Regions:
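Glycan-processing catalytic domains of CAZymes
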Residues: 1-176, 180, 188-191
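Surface-exposed, glycine/proline- and aromatic-rich loop segments on solvent-exposed faces
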Residues: 194-202
Length: 202
């Protein structure tokens, strides 16, 4: 890879990309960078590996607590530590384009022959998806991760793209339910719901 192309996944601190290549990066002309939920990368050998390998940079991995999943277990997968570390850095750099990995990649791609870097090969490798911890999808699931990553992503997207401040409630008002709607005009914040969009949730 080179700094003159766009990336789709990177270890923290993520690679920076510019149409002017490394010279553009050095001048701070950053065009694009990536944010990943997890990376199929071995943090000991510093090589690409399968998600069912060892020392993989899963959802709970951070550079200051590499083996969090081994110590804390499945609960650690729910908090998006690696995603947050990468997104916080992306917000600091603030490039015009962010590529977030991933969405709708739920497939178990098994490689029967050894796969990975020279010192990180895995037999019967599940390259991109293996378990809740060792996978990188953001979309909601009925499993243990539920909608945690979706809402974490929404939170960071609002920070990156900008959003109106959350309205603050106005003063308490006593409403006479028989006195008409004009008395609601001073109630803040104003909330308008789409008509007919409430459906049963599973």
């Amino acid at each position: 890879t080179s700094a003159k192309q766009w990336g789709w996944l990177s270890v923290f601190p993520q690679a920076l990309y510019s149409t002017r290549g490394q010279k553009g990066v050095e001048k701070g002309e950053i065009e694009q960078m990536t944010v990943g939920v997890a990376v199929n990368h071995n943090y000991v050998t510093k090589e690409i590996t399968a998600m069912n390998g060892v020392n993989v940079m899963g959802r709970s991995y951070t550079t200051d607590y590499e083996n969090r999943y081994d110590v804390e277990g499945a609960e650690a997968s729910k908090w998006g530590y690696q995603f947050s570390q990468q997104f916080d850095y992306a917000l600091e750099v603030s490039p015009p384009v962010l590529f977030v990995t991933g969405w709708n990649e739920w497939h178990a791609w098994r490689q029967p022959t050894p796969w990975g870097g020279a010192n990180s090969q895995v037999n019967n490798a599940l390259v991109d998806q293996f378990s809740d911890e060792f996978s990188r999808d953001l979309e909601p699931t009925k499993g243990a991760l539920q909608d945690h990553y979706y809402y974490l992503f929404v939170n960071y997207a609002r920070k990156y793209k900008g959003a109106s401040p959350i309205p603050t409630p106005g003063e308490n008002v006593t409403i006479d339910m028989t006195a008409g709607t004009d008395q609601w005009k001073t109630v803040e914040p104003y909330y308008a719901a789409y008509i007919g969009n409430t459906f049963d949730r599973d």
